[in-house]
């Protein structure tokens, strides 16, 4: 089910107000309805289908297991961007775009690892450090968290960018273009629409309008998560917040996904291993492809492996206290329960054992 909104919502949010006519970008001419009191008025008849297309792109990306990066560093967008990304289990940059955040991911990953190390040191009580050293570490953590906190669990470059204000976020858009990453953006009358995959002509300054865009994109991402879980055969109706998506009628879909995700050598041990959660020093046979779990990238796989988790049957056996402990140990901020890893793992296990 597509995310619904109306033209009236856009009107009430002020999405149709562009900039003063002398501040326009001529490339936005096709999207301008007219001029009133020297202010360009955006043609919402074009905005509505364009926004629908962007929402569908976000939903499809997440349903395939992709990652969406919300980008909005201007003051009036920062809070809405962060809230929407967190609510939809996605990622965000709302402070300052660092050069190379996409094109030099290896260096950015090093900074993220430094953030994790500093965080662990401080949470461990910073034993052996002087008061001055603890203060310096605290300041370093705050600086790194502000710059990288929204992408520290992303695990790799995103599959789609959602951008507020293409003028301010030109560097992010250029990096995405270099890597072939599609961009969905709110494009005002003073912006250049070139290079934007999903152009949404609308006001990018009004706080109420920005909040509406972010809410719609977040809802589209959440819908995509539900669709992705449905395609895996997960019982979304048993979740704390079930979605309205229907499970696929063809059980072969689940079987084919599970056969790729679980090594055949593990199936014989499933009955013995799923009664209780256990952490292993090494995988039993070939490790499972944990990246098939929602929101799991290579870095999260490494963290899980370091914690002794290699197989779906381990995660499938987790009870509430096991989830809480592992989540706290790995600082996952509730991701295991939120993204439904246990339910997904059980679906893989059951399909492989059938």
Swiss-Prot record:
**SUPFAM superfamilies named in the record:** Ribosomal protein S2 (SSF52313)
Question: What family does this belong to?
Answer: Belongs to the universal ribosomal protein uS2 family.
Membrane spanning stretches:
none
- A GO cellular component annotation in the UniProt record: cytosolic small ribosomal subunit
What PANTHER family does the record point to? 30S RIBOSOMAL PROTEIN S2 PROKARYOTIC AND ORGANELLAR, SMALL RIBOSOMAL SUBUNIT PROTEIN US2M
Q: Which domain of life is it from?
A: Bacteria
**Does the UniProt entry include the keyword Ribosomal protein?**
yes
What HAMAP family does the record tag this protein with? Ribosomal_uS2_B
Query: Which BP terms from GO are recorded?
Result: translation
**Keywords in alphabetical order:** Ribonucleoprotein, Ribosomal protein
Full protein name:
Small ribosomal subunit protein uS2
GO MF annotations in UniProt: structural constituent of ribosome
The protein's gene is named: rpsB
> Gene3D superfamilies under this entry?
5' to 3' exonuclease, C-terminal subdomain, Glucose-6-phosphate isomerase like protein, domain 1, Helix hairpin bin
